[in-house]
Amino acid sequence: DSAGRPLALSAPGRLLRHLAGLIGQKLTTDALLTLLKHPLTFSGGDRGDHLRLTRDLELTLRRKGPVFPVGADLIHWAAARKDASALTWAQTLAQTLDTALHATPRRLADHVALHRHLAEALARGTAPEGSGGLWEKEAGEAARVLMETLAAEADAGGELTRADYRDLFESLVNRGEVRDPIARHPGVLILGPREAREQGASLVILGGLNDGTWPRLPEPDPWLNRKMRKDAGLL
């Protein structure tokens, strides 16, 4: 598909957008669970164990709260389970969440660096290094290029509030596209209007438009239905 896919709706794009809106803000239960259930969260470690702990944590938060969980709440919950892997998981997560909560970046460069650090830490999870699947495949590459371009131009951005940075990032990521370089079938292409004008084909099959303007629909007739008019050669 020559139009590509919106970067903002890809897995890396969604994760980066979630994090951009959470920096310096109180974390609600729903916002926390949105992050934990994202397919890239803790993708660098044991994803199955992460999902198991996320499920158990959700049950506790839904029943007992708190409404605005912080890192200490997660560590306390994990310590009560007497499970070493759960405690390691909670401590890793708490460090990332507390960094996002208490961060006070001012310059654009600081916003970008913090944003990338949080995304990579969340995707890495309990793995000793790396960034999980955050920058992998076409969508990850497009997201990485966006962050690197923003960092390269950040010196000209001056100081921004957290809300200003969130709005800036939203506007940039919504312009991004993810293009799949792999042709699914050599004889089938889905082209936009611009690309279609630049191509030639030995056979062109014209289909109807969605709005029904072409081919034009026959006018209603009080005497003959469409089939009768077609049989009579009137269509």
Predicted regions mapped to residue ranges:
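Polyanion-engaging groove/track-forming segments
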Residues: 1-235
